[in-house]
């Protein structure tokens, strides 16, 4: 992430994992936060701000459930977690996306903003 957004270098860690299916991937994101929070607060924030770019679900989903999804990613609220390390909180969020259609639609949305 720091290579794309240098101002975030060292602040967040994330990876995108292409799962062994023809059309589906996930983002595994870990962020250190300054303000202590809860899993419920995090999920409430994602749910409240859900839109065509970033959706939110609490349904138990798997990679095949997001095939043909046009959103940038779908946050899986069931997998949100908080890890406490030396008095600091690491927020763990997982989001699924269609690495074909979802990616294409996200590129179109990005181009519209340029």
Feature locations, PLM:
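C-terminal substrate-binding/catalytic lobe of Rossmann-fold NAD(P)-dependent oxidoreductases
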Residues: 1-91
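Internal hydrophobic alpha-helix adjacent to the cofactor/substrate pocket in enzyme cavities
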Residues: 105-114
